[in-house]
């Protein structure tokens, strides 16, 4: 999300008084971070003495994590964002742009990079794909040895430039940029408190901005501890990367909802990214995940680690393996490709059916379909061809024209389908309307039978950890039985991946995943659900800012010549 331009810098007085304006900026600066080729991990206790209340060190290495959105057009879960951080490479910004290319599937509506050169932070952000935002001329404006980057996916109305990350802030005492993958479930209450108690002025509609306001109001020293203190107020899902004039910092939430990995290039440069596919592209060797609750600090002295908040049971997002991550990534210590292949094999074992061919809804259903076909002993063929040139913004006022949307994206191969009993494997069903169109498309192409197999359990609850899902009332699996859904979409049979079999596949790691979208049981209760539980219709977040003038007691009213009332004391 892009910082708003032409805003005042935070003054020393504004830090202590509740009238503080926020120091967002969108103008370039620079910053040159010194670098040490240190391939060993320094003492992890080295930061503990700086904390006013020592934090527990040594996070559990089993912890790891994700982010997301549901598209009104194809109704698939959409990854809300991806993050990258690089320290110690003279080509940091260019490597950052390449890594963002690898993470493009996690967000297509905006991209940004902040680089550090000569003790200045400089930003380039834009709306669109990475290739559109970062042509060579823009990358040449981002010299330096450290950088962070972000790709964003948002719902309609939130794609404006000011919401494109990384966010960049100038404080009186330092400058910092942040990129965020996740969602703060206590964002509204934090923002209300900051506005009411500190006079904070927000410049975006993003929850990420609250982090920078928390840093501004923190009383901790040195600056690194302001970041740590700010993160201690956050609840929900977050994988954060920060860059300052001399440091690269990564923070992962205690539950490890969102993934964040660390690697190294051969020159010793440290790389942080949402997925290992980004490391692979820029020839960085995977080292490990950033543990849930861990803070990683990279500077010229090396790498330091401390634990923000430890948690005995991580709650990593299972949908990372079902849909979000690329198949060539390793997420939460598991191969995404192998996970999806196993999902398909389980479907073939648990829900077999007589068929002639197995096809996939491309691209996310392909690997599960391969697993299904191999287990069932039935040939896999490419029965649907996906067009990669149709944007999600294809919206027409006429329903008759709008119905062409699926046909624009998916074209049936008649030679594969005609007269065949077809098993079609997809990753999920959300509202069900797209599935019904796919079934109709296949039957119109000559399929004798269409059997839908879904490589995840039924989605019955909304996600509050970085995914813009429909309300529970809109989720078809929350309203209908499997048989009712089958009739609705028009398939000859329908089966989902059983949740208990999914957990069995995960083995000892099963307790370390979040299944809230399948069960409605949330590891961290969102504010929206708290309101429902307490019987509160809504919280008054605006503090009556837009209240009636007549209710303001200012010692009487006077009227000017135009009849406009002015308060007088």
From Swiss-Prot:
Any one Pfam family match given in the protein's UniProt record, by short name: Pribosyltran
Where on the tree of life does the source sit, at the highest rank? Eukaryota
Polar residues bias locations: 22-45
Where is the protein found, in the record's own terms? Plastid, Chloroplast
Quote the pathway field.
Purine metabolism; IMP biosynthesis via de novo pathway; N(1)-(5-phospho-D-ribosyl)glycinamide from 5-phospho-alpha-D-ribose 1-diphosphate: step 1/2
Q: Where is the transit peptide?
A: 1-80
From which residue to which does any coiled coil extend?
Answer: none
Single GO biological process annotation from the record: purine nucleobase biosynthetic process
- List every stretch annotated Disordered: 1-51
What Gene Ontology terms describe where this protein resides (cellular component)? chloroplast; cytoplasm
Q: Where is the active site?
A: 81 (nucleophile)
Free-text comment on the cofactor: Binds 1 Mg(2+) ion per subunit.
- Bias-annotated ranges (Low complexity): 1-21
Q: Which residues bind Mg(2+)?
A: 364, 426-427
Q: What molecular function terms (GO) are annotated for this protein?
A: 4 iron, 4 sulfur cluster binding; amidophosphoribosyltransferase activity; metal ion binding
SUPFAM superfamilies registered for this protein in UniProt:
N-terminal nucleophile aminohydrolases (Ntn hydrolases), PRTase-like
Main subcellular localization, coarse class? plastid
The keyword Manganese is assigned to this record: no
Q: Which InterPro entries match?
A: GATase_2_dom, Ntn_hydrolases_N, PRibTrfase_dom, PRTase-like, PurF, PurF_N
Query: Which part of the chain is the Glutamine amidotransferase type-2 domain?
Result: 81-301
**NCBIfam families linked:** purF
The record's listing under PANTHER family reads: AMIDOPHOSPHORIBOSYLTRANSFERASE
Q: What is this protein called?
A: Amidophosphoribosyltransferase, chloroplastic
Gene name tied to this protein: PUR1
